[in-house]
Amino acid sequence: MSNQELKTTMSKSIEAAQRNFNTIRTGRANTSLLDRISVEYYGAETPLKSLATITTPDSQTIAIQPFDLGSLASIEKAIATSDLGFTPNNDGKIIRINVPPLTEERRKEFCKLASKYAEEGKVALRNIRREAIDRVKKSEKDGDLSEDQSRDEQETIQKETDNFIKDIEKKLSEKEAEILKV
């Protein structure tokens, strides 16, 4: 695995962690809160964002305007039964969701969830590091790399891993600050 391939693979783990962070409520309306919602539409689970236009008219409201008004009830049901805790308001054309301010208790829960997502990202990075180091050790064992080259490669891999872990920790602290901001 080249250094560039390693960075690309690790970047994908960072992006996955960031996507997870984006699904955490912060007390402000954000369209990415609805990214994980799937709607039963003509017998198939369909992502909400492919069935409707999702906008944030103000900082406390999310508006969902379906392309097909026949899907309105299904969208409303999917939002109501999701784990987000939102109550959708259906006016026959648009579904509005009021995003209530977070209580202190909910803020702490969301910080724990963000920490969990960060830890999952770090574990993924460590697994990538382990695989890369195993490949280097195998190359050394097969005689493709000298002992010094192997050590240098392993140090480079470790430095890259450390940089990416710092990146996740930075994103986590930013998300926690955003969650705790009243």
From Swiss-Prot:
Belongs to the RRF family. This is Ribosome-recycling factor. Keywords: Cytoplasm, Protein biosynthesis. Responsible for the release of ribosomes from messenger RNA at the termination of protein biosynthesis. May increase the efficiency of translation by recycling ribosomes from one round of translation to another. InterPro entries: Ribosome_recyc_fac, Ribosome_recyc_fac_dom, RRF_sf. The gene is frr. It comes from the Bacteria. Pfam families: RRF (PF01765). Transmembrane segments: none annotated. One of its GO terms (biological process) is translational termination. It is found in: Cytoplasm. GO terms for cellular component: cytoplasm. GO terms for molecular function: ribosomal large subunit binding. Residues 136-160 are annotated as: Disordered.
